[in-house]
Structure formats: structure tokens, C-alpha cells
Amino acid sequence: MKKRIQVHIPYRMLIERLEDVLSAGLNPEIYTDAATLDSIRPKDLKDTREILAEKGLRITLHGPYMDLSPGASDEKIRLITVERYRQTFEAAQLLLPETIVLHAGYDERRFDGDVPLWLSQSRKTWPRFIKEAEKMGSVIAVENVFEENPLPIKRLVESMNSPNFRVCFDTGHLNLFSKVKMEEWFNELGSKVSEVHLHDNRGKWDEHLIIGDGNIDFP
């Protein structure tokens, strides 16, 4: 079971606490924000991968999300997102993660309920990265954040129709933003889910609490 569990950690923290990660045998889900992508050296990424591989640790990668929108109606914003994802995949080619987590990006309020608009823009963004994931043997997992129900993500994943494009289900985000229960998410997306983010909150803030310290009713 431990081999299938990842621990989310920003890249800079991973480097600072690398000995602790290695001694504890933790499989890292490495978070790379925009500042990290702009400053990191390819050699450092390769060295990190090799050190973790020597200990038999598997890597997953979480790409940037602040200010980004892969389905943005503003084409310039979408293209900025594409550029950040391009950098993410450059890092991925050196880290060779099993999964690359990126936010799906649908928000009922920002898109005024226009799922078709978001979907049409999203379909421009993902195909090139799906091809890169296929070459690396990695899976892109799009994560729920502000989505109120699973249908926008389901439509996106089905439209891409690739085994390398799946879903990352986040329990904390569901507790904050979803209008339907967890069971409905898994009824709609269960076969498409390749990763689950397990954390808790009290229903007001994305606190990332230990399971049991919030109010999520885990099955």
C-alpha cells in the first residue's frame, strides 16, 4: 500500500528536506510553481530523480495553477497557461513522473455556467500535452477544484479519449465547492480516476488538515 501513497511537497522544500524524505521512504508528489519553473536547473531535476530512484521511490508531479486557466475564454490567458504547462512538461521529461496533476479549471461563476465555452477552449490546450505524456509513459490527471459537480470534468476527459488523460479527485475541494455528494463523483468518474488527494477541512477554507480533523464524512 505504501508504494501507492504520495506525499505532496513543493520542490524547494523537497530539496531542503531531502534526507528526511529519503529516510522516511516517502514517495513525493513534487509541486512546481511558476517561480520554480523559471529558476530550476535541468541538472538539478535529473539529480533529484536519480537520488529518489536509488531509494526505489516513485515520483508524481503537480504543475502550477495560480492565475492559470487551461479553458480560458481569453485566448491570451489560455496561451500563458500553455506556456507554463510546456515548462512543466520540460521538467517532467527529467523527473519522469508516473502522473502529472494539473487543475481542470472550470468554475461555474467565472464561466457563467457556459460549460461548452470552457470545453471548447480546453480542447485546444490538452492534445499536445497528452501526446507528450504518452511518449513519457505518464498520465495527466486533471484535478477538481471549483467544480460543483463531476460533469464538466467527465465531458472533458471523455472528449480527449486517451488512457493518458484521467482524473485526480480531491476530497478537500469537494467539501468546499461541490453541490453533490462524493458518491456521485465516483459514480460518474470512478473508472477515470487515477489519483486521489486525501485531506480534510472544516468546509470554509482549503486547510489541508489531517483526515479526521475536519468535517468530511469519509466513507
Model region roles, listed by residue range:
Residues 71-166:
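Active-site acidic/histidine proton-transfer and metal-coordination neighborhood
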Residues 127-215:
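Acidic/histidine-rich catalytic cores of soluble enzymes
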Residues 8-12, 31-35, 64-66, 105-107, ...:
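Active-site beta-loop-alpha junctions enriched in small/polar residues
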Residues 48-66, 121-135, 218-219:
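Alpha-helix-loop-beta-strand connector modules within alpha/beta enzyme cores
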Residues 67-72, 108-113, 175-177, 204-209:
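A short acidic, helix-capping loop that chelates divalent metal ions and anchors anionic groups
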